[in-house]
Amino acid sequence: MGTLYVVATPIGNLADITLRALDVLRTVDVVACEDTRRTRALLSHFGIHKRLVSCRAHNEAQAARRLIHFLSTPISAFLSPEKGRGRQSARRTRARPGETVGTAALQLAAEATGEQEVCGSPHAQVAYVSDAGTPGVSDPGAVLVRAVRDAGHTVVPIPGASALTTLLSVAGVRDKTVLFEGFLSPHPGRRRARLVQLCAQRVAFVLYESPYRVQKLLEDLVAVAPESQVVLGRELTKVHEELCVGTALRVMESFCARTRVRGECVLLVSAEKF
């Protein structure tokens, strides 16, 4: 059967990509990705040109079905020139450098498989990447992984960058237990209610937030637990990387004084002082 590689990509600094990730991206047949434009730019930076299949949160289940069909296809069934319709299908499923493969191309691969049985031929290999970081960690990927595994294919992790572990490595947190919460609800009432629950557990927790809502999140945190300890990372691994450490009140005052916050934010919140 085929193999799905779940590949972590840099969260900012492209030099953080691993040698193993590059090797996999160079050798797979198709790269499924959250945003084809961003992934095409990433691959082009490293001189890699592959077929791209869109697999975003809103179409992940549909994309998973297409990719499973692809993973079940012997490579030679649609890459080797054959007579008649099989030859036409083989030509049409070849992608030009950087070309995106849509439903029609994958369907042609399935049609070619139905026309002939190739014993002993290796099956397709697919890589999945999110826009940045590790797929499935507050990013699409979980639906695809479950579907591919349930279909009997192999799923292989290719570890690498993650905003979660990047922040933890420089936070200096001593807590043995750290809860990863990810993104809270954008709804103010639900967000504050969840913060009340999290702070009541007296366990360090990690949040992700967009630059557009981080000030509101900090205001809610101050209302719930103003003396809680916060490490806020912004633009991690990028040129304007910033770490802000202090009480929730101090960090909020620092950020609310700005007219505009740029870059994704990661927050570690703890009752214990760092």
From Swiss-Prot:
Keywords from UniProt, A to Z, are: Cytoplasm, Methyltransferase, rRNA processing, S-adenosyl-L-methionine, Transferase
Q: In Gene Ontology terms, what is one molecular function of this protein?
A: rRNA (cytosine-2'-O-)-methyltransferase activity
Under catalytic activity, the entry for this protein gives: cytidine(1402) in 16S rRNA + S-adenosyl-L-methionine = 2'-O-methylcytidine(1402) in 16S rRNA + S-adenosyl-L-homocysteine + H(+)
Q: A single GO CC term, please?
A: cytoplasm
Q: What class of enzyme is it?
A: transferase
The secretion signal range is none
Q: What is this protein called?
A: Ribosomal RNA small subunit methyltransferase I
Q: Which organism is it from?
A: Treponema pallidum (strain Nichols)
Upper classification of the source organism reads:
Bacteria, Pseudomonadati, Spirochaetota, Spirochaetia, Spirochaetales
Give the gene that encodes this protein.
rsmI
